[in-house]
Curated annotation (Swiss-Prot):
Gene Ontology molecular function: any one: proton-transporting ATP synthase activity, rotational mechanism
Location(s), subcellular: Cell inner membrane
PROSITE patterns found in the cross-reference section: ATPASE_DELTA
Lineage per the UniProt record: Bacteria, Pseudomonadati, Pseudomonadota, Alphaproteobacteria, Hyphomicrobiales
Protein's name in the database: ATP synthase subunit delta
HAMAP family linked: ATP_synth_delta_bact
Family matches, as InterPro entries: ATP_synth_OSCP/delta_N_sf, ATPase_OSCP/d_CS, ATPase_OSCP/dsu
Alphabetical list of SUPFAM superfamilies matching this protein: N-terminal domain of the delta subunit of the F1F0-ATP synthase
Family: Belongs to the ATPase delta chain family.
One Pfam family cited in the UniProt record for this chain: OSCP
Gene Ontology terms: cellular component: plasma membrane; proton-transporting ATP synthase complex
Gene: atpH
């Protein structure tokens, strides 16, 4: 994911801000957020779609046609579908993951929540997510909207990012720390 000082992040934030303003005017923030979550899930599940959004080989028109077909088939219509088409025509599809993340953060702030990115070694159950939200609420001081991704390389535990803070309780990090400590001793 892009760092906040990168040009991708700036592009993503501007597009996400514009989409949020339009969604707010149309009273469809929840629908747009749901559509973006669906598109993100499709991205995570399809290497071909990932290749399409990242490849400079395809023209903006080709990307727009492909995205239109994919969005229509997935039921992503209206504001979100139009947004994805415009992003494709403007050759900014490479920034869509950042746009989705930025939109989530803006929407969470609008609801009085703070957004947290949670990376887990295994899929979290609904009960675990509820418990995690409660724990993060006590740390953040307000409701927390979490976005969970699974990374089996963590082996166990969680990595939680809230704003500029990161809480890393992953087994991978603990093992790496132990490895470094053993190198210093030996």
């Amino acid at each position: 994911m892009a760092q906040s000082s990168s040009p991708i992040s700036g592009v993503a934030e501007r597009y996400a801000g514009s989409l949020f303003e339009l969604a707010l005017q149309a009273n469809s923030v929840a629908k747009v957020e749901s559509d973006l979550n669906s598109f993100e899930a499709m991205l995570a599940g399809s290497s071909d779609l990932t290749r399409l959004i990242n490849s400079p080989v395809f023209s903006g028109e080709e990307q727009a046609k492909a995205i239109a077909a994919i969005a229509d088939k997935a039921g992503i219509t209206g504001l979100t579908g139009n947004f994805l088409r415009v992003v494709a025509r403007n050759r900014r599809l490479f920034a869509v993951p950042g746009m989705i993340k930025a939109f989530r953060q803006i929407a969470a702030e609008h609801r009085g929540e703070t957004a947290a990115e949670v990376t887990s070694a295994h899929e979290l159950t609904a009960a675990q997510q509820t418990e995690l939200k409660a724990a993060l609420k006590s740390v953040a001081g307000k409701d927390v909207a979490i976005s969970v991704t699974v990374d089996p390389s963590l082996l166990g535990g969680l990595v939680v990012k809230i704003g500029s803070r990161q809480i890393d309780t992953s087994l991978k990090t603990k093992l790496n720390s132990l490895k470094l400590a053993l190198k210093e001793v030996g």
